[in-house]
């Protein structure tokens, strides 16, 4: 089984997140995508962070595809930081092939994540295009550090077979929706 792991605060979740998930399912040939709602992000302010239960319920509403499973692994496992969460998930599911999925906008700060290189050396990574990040991803520390491990986008469907480090950049339809803009009221009438 091939499972994509798509984590974030999803504050709030919106159709742009669902689009990233759908692109990942299709282009990577995923059997499932685990939409991992985090209790919080140490790199972001918690001032406007909606309660976890609310973000989970909204994520379930937005993620209509039955292959998408909305989870709160970090809270359930009692861990924080993505690297720790992923290590626990992998240890409990040794029969599953995992791919870490992230939007290209998150790639610019990926090097600030705790144990980011460990994540890249443990899981193949699929970076999905986001507005404003199409070219900037090339200058990210992750892509420079692991340039040798890039998998051509045409081979994205076999990314799960690659030993980490391995990563690909996936182009596709993009949504201009942003959780920050929605929270700040900059997207009037936005469908979350």
Curated annotation (Swiss-Prot):
HAMAP family: NaMN_adenylyltr. InterPro entries: Cyt_trans-like, NadD/NMNAT, Rossmann-like_a/b/a_fold. Signal peptide: none annotated. The keyword Nucleotidyltransferase applies. The gene is nadD. The keyword Nucleotidyltransferase applies. It comes from the Bacteria. One of its GO terms (biological process) is NAD biosynthetic process. Its EC number is 2.7.7.18. Belongs to the NadD family. GO terms for molecular function: ATP binding; nicotinate-nucleotide adenylyltransferase activity. This is Probable nicotinate-nucleotide adenylyltransferase. It catalyses: nicotinate beta-D-ribonucleotide + ATP + H(+) = deamido-NAD(+) + diphosphate. It is an enzyme of class 2 (transferase). Catalyzes the reversible adenylation of nicotinate mononucleotide (NaMN) to nicotinic acid adenine dinucleotide (NaAD). Pathway: Cofactor biosynthesis; NAD(+) biosynthesis; deamido-NAD(+) from nicotinate D-ribonucleotide: step 1/1. Keywords: ATP-binding, NAD, Nucleotide-binding, Nucleotidyltransferase, Pyridine nucleotide biosynthesis, Transferase. Pfam families: CTP_transf_like (PF01467).
């Amino acid at each position: 089984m091939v499972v994509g792991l798509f984590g974030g605060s999803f504050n709030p979740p919106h159709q742009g997140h669902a689009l990233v998930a759908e692109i990942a399912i299709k282009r990577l040939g995923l059997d499932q995508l685990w939409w991992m709602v985090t209790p919080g992000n140490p790199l972001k302010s918690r001032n406007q962070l909606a309660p976890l239960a609310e973000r989970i319920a909204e994520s379930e509403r937005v993620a209509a595809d039955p292959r998408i499973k909305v989870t709160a692994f970090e809270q359930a496992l009692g861990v924080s930081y993505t690297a720790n969460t992923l290590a626990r998930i992998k240890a409990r599911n040794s029969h599953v092939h995992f791919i870490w999925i992230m939007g290209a906008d998150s790639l610019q700060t990926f090097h600030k994540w705790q144990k980011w290189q460990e994540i890249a050396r443990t899981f193949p990574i699929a970076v999905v295009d986001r507005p404003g990040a199409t070219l900037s991803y090339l200058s990210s520390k992750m892509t420079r550090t692991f340039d040798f491990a890039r998998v051509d986008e045409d081979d994205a469907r076999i990314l799960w077979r690659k030993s980490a480090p391995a990563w690909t950049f996936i182009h596709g339809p993009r949504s201009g929706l942003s959780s920050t803009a929605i929270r700040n009221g900059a997207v009037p009438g936005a469908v979350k």
